[in-house]
Amino acid sequence: MKTNITYISAIAFHSVLGLLLYLNESLGKPYFFIALFYFLYRIITASDKSRTLEVLKACAYFVGAEVLLRTTKGSISYEAGKYLVILFVLMGMFYKGISGKGYPYFIYLLFLIPSIFVASTTLSFDANFRTNIAFVLSGPVCLGLSALFCYDKRISYNQISQIMLFMVLPIIAHTAYIYFYTPNLKDVISSTASNRAAAGGWGANQVSAILGLGMFLMAIRLFTKSATLPLKILNASILGLITLRAITTMSRGGVITAIAAIVIYLFYYYRHSKVRKRNEIISIFGLLCVSLMLTWFVSVSQTGGLVGLRYANKDHLGREKESLTTGRSELFEGELEGFISSPFFGIGSSRAKDERIEQEGQGVTSHSEFSRTLAEHGIFGVIILLILIFKPLEIRGRNRGNYYFYPLMAFWFLTINHMSMRLAMPAFIYALALLNVKNEKRPLYRKQLKEQKV
């Protein structure tokens, strides 16, 4: 009961926080620093046994808050979310060390370096070398260090639920902020293009991605942490509210990623559950479907049917659009051409964007981390991708009972292919898949036998 009250209080607090940030965006800076010092204090003062958990909670919270802090200008820098995750995992390494079995991720980090030297000779004179390199490599470095720290770290299912809760709480605050920012969607949506106003005044792609993460986390919570009917209704309602605003950003990537990850999660969760638990899963699945269907109908109603046209790949007049990928396929092909032209050392970090500026007059950032990695890192990029894809399968082979592995890997893979690594989120999600998740051992209670006097 006490846990449920604490959970509801945390939701209420973050909902109010979203309102306060809407009323006064200057509160974003104090919010950022209070959260930062709070988690630093928790990590430093934690016992050795709980320090890994505290590090992961800190990372999770700032992953969930990253887009909200960008929206409200609360971060000290645009890439602060990635830098803080790097800071926290480095602290974790200092206190807890790393597994020797994770050495391929050290190789992965080393293979990022040659592209910097190549970029020093290929980037145009007008390009800002330091900021361009930092923007492109901060995500991959964040992933590599997070993976090094998390690889084979033993953690319980209850602890990973806590980590996911810390990740979704700031997303709840962000959702509240968006509702107050745009209370009436009909006022701002007039086409099927991605809508910045409906996304709370920030890039719809990033907002859709982070709200998609919220959908995924709340769906998991609905199945694993909803012991009572009121909690089931509460979690299903929050899921519906997040989903509604994710859909109405008119950016499809985050929503599709979330739904795919939820389906994969349910498959493995159901498969690893006992017969009695499976009956409960089926009933909750019905509640999930009702919540999502109701949300869809509300979104269609509030947008005058434009959401339906968007997901059917049509414009506001109902005409079929030429491309389903909204220009991403052209970017992908261009980056593959870069790989073919420089297959050994690549074209250099950030050069793909730089080339688009020279050729088209505008530097559209890559949406696919795979094609960007191949183009900018060459043969080293091929090895990097092989490490990222195949190394996790080793830990999966040693822990087949972890039903979070494939959903997390799927979420990472789909995210980096629709928005690259603009956020710290895909890096941290990937690292979570490398944790060695086990059931908690129940303490054995033995009766003490007293010697009887004769």
Q: What is the predicted function of each stretch?
A:
Residues 77-91, 102-121, 125-152, 165-168, ...:
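Aromatic-anchored transmembrane helix interface
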Residues 42, 405-414, 420-454:
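Transmembrane alpha-helices of multi-pass inner-membrane enzymes
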Residues 19-32, 71-79, 131-135, 201-208, ...:
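Helix-loop-helix junctions and helix-breaking kinks within/between transmembrane helices
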Residues 1-95, 115-121, 411-413:
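N-terminal signal-anchor transmembrane segment
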Residues 195-197, 277-284, 294-330, 354-357:
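Flexible juxtamembrane loops connecting transmembrane helices in multi-pass membrane enzymes
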Residues 145-146, 159-189, 202-271:
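Alpha-helical transmembrane segments of multi-pass inner-membrane proteins
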Residues 263, 375-415:
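Hydrophobic transmembrane alpha-helices and their immediate junctions
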Residues 313-377:
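Long extracytoplasmic/lumenal interhelical loops at the membrane interface
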